[in-house]
Amino acid sequence: MTTTTLTLAQLIDETLDQLYYEIEKPRPLLLGAAIDASQTTLTVASNAEVATITDLLEAGSELMLITAKTDDANPTFTVLRGYSRTDAVAHAKNDVVLVNPYWTRSAVTRALQRFFTGAAPVWLPLIRAEMMNTVEYAGVGQQLIPLDSDVIRVLEVRYQSPTSGRVVNLPGWRFEDNLPSAVVSSGMGLRVPSTVSPSDDLLVSMSVRYAWSGSGEDATVDVPAGCEDIPALYAAAVLASGREVSRLELDRLTEQSSEQAARTGSNVGLIRLKWQEVYRRLDEARRTISVPRPLVYRRFQRGA
C-alpha cells in the first residue's frame, strides 16, 4: 500500500481552516519577551488592551488563563500555565499568541487522535505486507508465526515458490489473537498448516493500527495515499457537531427553525453539510484502497 506521511501540525492547520472563516479567526498578539515553561508572567508587543482578566491565551498548543493584569502603559499579565490539560512549554519573543480562540489546537488534536484510534482503522484500513517464514520462530513452534501488537487482523497469506517465484494463496491458515503471553509476547500469531516448510516464504497482508512517530506537533502519521484530507474533515465535523454523526442520522438531520439552532447552540445545516462531505470523501477513498479478502476453503468430503 502506498502511504503519505502527515504531521500533526499540518493536520491541525487544515482542520482549523475547515472551521474558521478568515474574518472569524481570533485576534493575534506577539509576545513582548521570551518566557520559559515555569514563568507565570508575560507581556505583549502591542494591542494589550484586547486581552483582560479571565481571557484565554493560546501560544502554540499551550493554553494560558489570564488571572491578573497591571495598569501600566505596557501591562504585565499573570497567567495560569498549561490550562485545560495542555503542556506548559517555553516560547520565544514575538511568538504569536491568540486571544480567546473558539477552536483550540489542543481540542483539534484530541479530535484527530480520536479519528486515528477509532474510525480510521475501520473506514480506511492501513495494510502492511511482510515476507515471513517459520524458521525464524522455531523457538515457539514452526507452525506459529508471532505477529506485532499493532496487527488488527490478517487479511491474506500467500506462498511464494522458491524456484519459480510464483505467488499463490495459502489455505488453512488461522489468525490467533488471544494467545498466552508465555507463547507469544504480543498475544497474537499466525498459525499455518503443517504442509508449510520452515524455509518457505510467506507473504502476509495485515491490517494494522495507525501509529504516531515523534512527539508534539512534529509527530507524523502515515495514511493511505489519496486520503490525506479525510482526517481534517472528520475532526472539523466532530468539533462542529460535538460528536460523530452516522449516515442514518444525516437522513433525519434537518434544521427546522432558527429557534432549534439557537437552542442547540449550533448550525444544524452546517453540521449536515460537513458530515456529508466526510462520507462522500470516504466513499471516494475506499474505492482506491484494495483490501484483500480472505478466501473461504471448504474441505472436500469423499463420498458426498
Where do the protein language model's features map onto the residues?
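Catalytic Cys-His active-site segments of thiol-dependent hydrolases/isopeptidases
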Residues: 76-84
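Glycine-enriched, solvent-exposed interface loops adjoining structured elements
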Residues: 1-36, 48-64, 68-75, 87-304
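Short alpha-helix capping/helix-loop boundary micro-motifs
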Residues: 39-46, 83-84
